[in-house]
Amino acid sequence: MARQTPITRYRNIGISAHIDAGKTTTTERILFYTGVSHKIGEVHDGAATMDWMEQEQERGITITSAATTCFWSGMGNQFPQYRINVIDTPGHVDFTIEVERSMRVLDGACMVYCAVGGVQPQSETVWRQANKYKVPRLAFVNKMDRTGANFFRVVEQMKTRLGANPVPIVVPIGAEDTFTGVVDLIEMKAIIWDEASQGMKFEYGEIPADLVDTAQEWRTNMVEAAAEASEELMDKYLEEGDLSKEDIIAGLRARTLASEIQVMLCGSAFKNKGVQRMLDAVIEFLPSPTEVKAIEGILDDKDETKASREASDEAPFSALAFKIMNDKFVGNLTFVRVYSGVLKQGDAVYNPVKSKRERIGRIVQMHANERQDIDEIRAGDIAACVGLKDVTTGDTLCDEKNIITLERMEFPDPVIQLAVEPKTKADQEKMSIALGRLAKEDPSFRVHTDEESGQTIIAGMGELHLDIIVDRMKREFGVEANIGKPMVAYRETIKKTVEQEGKFVRQTGGKGKFGHVYVRLEPLDVEAAGKEYEFAEEVVGGVVPKEFFGAVDKGIQERMKNGVLAGYPVVGVKAVLFDGSYHDVDSDELSFKMAGSYAFRDGFMKADPVLLEPIMKVEVETPEDYMGDIMGDLNRRRGMVQGMDDLPGGTKAIKAEVPLAEMFGYATQMRSMSQGRATYSMEFAKYAETPRNVAEGIIAKFQAGGKKGDDE
């Protein structure tokens, strides 16, 4: 089967924005105008086509990037048919993993901003992610019909907050309830959309008299931006004082692809105005798969040679699995972006990350939650495969004879964890299966079993992230679960060397028990030693027989697991068995194991024991206005500020080390201090001694019989 649309007429774009900028509504309109959905889905009714998980429709936020294919030939059918693959991305800070994941497979992006709220914190995070993957982008200012809408203020905010270089190619006619359409600066005509056909039809008209000067000023700005694309265009502009429509589009396109400028449009998706012109801009200014840098990877040879794959059907097959979803009807759906070659239904592919060969069952083209079976996918396509068992997010799929591993995505480690248990014992196995599947879909979510308590611990990127996981377990797998409070994993250690006797003697009728040891406990530098515990013996003259050394070691290690001070695992100790005695008849392994355990317990309390707490490396990015409040708050949380950097757009990056115990609820506090404009990331740095006043509270609770981990 030959290719239906030439690859030069493909556009793989992401639509991303801050929560409530109207991104899902914008995507809905795209599907409506391109003829994919016949009834417009409104988020207000919880019926949006792209938001297809139940939680999304309930909460009115987008969690998973659904990928959709649609076709567009221009507002006035002025283009041949183009194929647009749209990936809708979430706008909540706990889901940046989804944004990062979709940015990785896009060729271009459309940033949606609210005409009232402007550039908000998540917009800044998404902008940085788009910079990281060098994604060319355009901006759409939505909600022009809302009270307080101001297009030109958003243009300024893009410059100051994002360090962007926006070039408007339309200006709004009116604003708030008088918003009626836009002036197209390339055509220098007003565009008025027909309300009866929900904006399907439009007509060009004269520019309103009161807007002529504004339009002329912004047109000059746009033409100058286009002229800077090349010396040739600049010479033409200087000679003629203007550029033709074709030259303007060519100049703006070249600079957009080089990420030097961002073409900017506006409208109201809800009122069916402006999205149509934005679709034209996607075709005019965003790249096809052949216009972005060829994907790079590593070959399967001794030297791990770097190689690239051109976006062509003739090249060997290579694709990246960027999302895995569990579907009630077909099981695992693996979303892939094909970079090169062709894949047919039933073909075998090789996964170099897992060193496994797998066969593709069906290939489906997704339209939000509707699916259409197709026979093959080619370079530039985005589709979902059914039947892949061992693929996880970020894996490469390629031709078995031409193995290449495309660059892997990096996923942050989880920062919050809590215990979860099924409400009924019968659900235990169902819960394990559910958590396993969810962890496969989402690499930023982890599951493990706590060795001490036997509890199942789930870890993720934030409180909302884990809420939604628990919610999905209930809905998709029918498992009701109880969740514990967020926990900190403390550790215990010693600061000085001590020698301690340990004796275990039992004399009842018949055979007795006898174990007697002297153990020296020394502080061990975990980093230098490369281990958390070491056992040695310096026994002279056989006072403790060799066969009992292992038992003493075992007794000490078992005691270390559950701590002495506050019930947390002990680390950083070297135990040396140096003396003792035994009894020919009564000594056995158990006696020496108990003697070792007692020696450790008593010696530990004399060796200046301390509690260690996890310290996190925290980085807060905040506009300068809120810096004082944020620094003050970090100090109150026992944080140590390590340094500061200046970022574009007057943003400051504050780097600090803060105990994890002080970071619960931080996201909410930080958002309220900065009116939602600061963002933060945190990762584990090291363990450090807990200050005495904090440690005393934790120890007292443990000694009073309170459970460890309930450190509120």
Swiss-Prot record:
Every copy of the tr-type G domain together lies at 8-290
Q: Which domain of life is it from?
A: Bacteria
One BP annotation, GO: ribosome disassembly
The portions of this protein that span the membrane are none
**InterPro entries this protein is in?**
EFG_II, EFG_III, EFG_III/V, EFG_IV, EFG_V, EFG_V-like, EFTu-like_2, G_TR_CS
A molecular function (GO) held by this record is: GTPase activity
Q: What Pfam families does the record tag this protein with? A: EFG_C (PF00679), EFG_III (PF14492), EFG_IV (PF03764), GTP_EFTU (PF00009), GTP_EFTU_D2 (PF03144)
Q: What is the annotated role of this protein in its UniProt record?
A: Catalyzes the GTP-dependent ribosomal translocation step during translation elongation. During this step, the ribosome changes from the pre-translocational (PRE) to the post-translocational (POST) state as the newly formed A-site-bound peptidyl-tRNA and P-site-bound deacylated tRNA move to the P and E sites, respectively. Catalyzes the coordinated movement of the two tRNA molecules, the mRNA and conformational changes in the ribosome.
Q: Can you name this protein?
A: Elongation factor G
Tell me the organism: Acinetobacter baumannii (strain SDF)
- What gene is this protein a product of? fusA
